[in-house]
Amino acid sequence: MQTKIPVLSALALSFGLLSAHAFAANPETVTIGYQKANIFALLKYRGTLDETFKKEGINIRWVEFPAGPQMLEGLNVGSIDLAATGDAPPAFAQAAKADLIYLGHSPANPKTEAIVVPKDSPIKSVADLKGKRVGLNKGSDVNYLLVKALEDAGLNYKDVKPVYLPPADARAAFQKGAIDAWVIWDPFLAEVEANADAREIRNAEGLVPHYTFYLASRPFAEGHPDTAKQVVDELSKLSDWANANQDEAAAILSKSTGLDKSIWQTTLKRLPYGATRMTPQVFDEQQALADTFTRVGLLPVKVDVRSATWSLDKK
């Protein structure tokens, strides 16, 4: 009789773990944050994830945000479960003690962000930016590009006059000549090149990788790992479709953002979509970003990027 008790206990424990896992794999609702121009917007408008989850009894609630930092604040306070942002916002969120997890990343896309100047500007290179007014979104991916581009040109961040503006305000300032240069990402980059004859003096190639990260709140990623993995898988399938059907993807994103389809066609030609799980190399590159922001004083503390590793990726 004594020998049966441990066996029964083990069976009960196994059943409990399996039951908990099954429950965790099927949340009633998944709340996803998105921006009009990012891959989750494409996923929303395509409807493929909604269809997949509906078959499993899972509802999706889509919540729009104006930018990555606000989205990650929503992730931190529990108003959303999943988000996709560029590489800088998660580092700033981690510095603010946000309890997030890196689920995966896109391919590097350095051609989708650049430093531009007016067509007739005397500025010919990054070195010419010394003492100039440079518009950018503070704490964004392009903030990292500017720091690294200046250092590559033998300058430092204090050698320019940063003018911190969101894209819409920076676009107006660029048009009026209130800033000498603008550091910006697609599709805004493609738009200003097409409609304002902006001239590129440096993109991110050879300087910074520029990833999109797929992020989750820690409670969601650890509590519903199968669902989180399924989202990454769906993003990978969507990426394959978008890369092979750029005209259709451009039409969807044009509708989402209000930008001309031609702007999105230009953007998608230099934007490789994709979704893969995190690797040591990508964590190293993200750590380099965080360390750079700390070094130049944009982050108040040192960030341990790997503290946001998903338990499924720990070895």
For every predicted segment, state its role:
Residues 119-128, 155-157, 219-228:
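Short helix-loop capping/hinge motifs at secondary-structure junctions, enriched
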Residues 222-298:
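Secondary-structure end/capping motifs
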Residues 39-40, 109-115, 198-199, 210-214, ...:
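Small-molecule pocket liners
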Residues 9-19:
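Bacterial N-terminal signal peptides
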Residues 88, 162-255:
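Pocket-lining segment of extracytoplasmic ligand-binding domains
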Residues 291-315:
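Conserved C-terminal helix/tail region of periplasmic/extracytoplasmic solute-binding proteins
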Residues 25-153, 162-164, 180-184, 206-208:
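Short, glycine-/small- and polar/acidic-enriched structural segments
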Residues 1-9:
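Bacterial N-terminal signal peptides that target proteins for export
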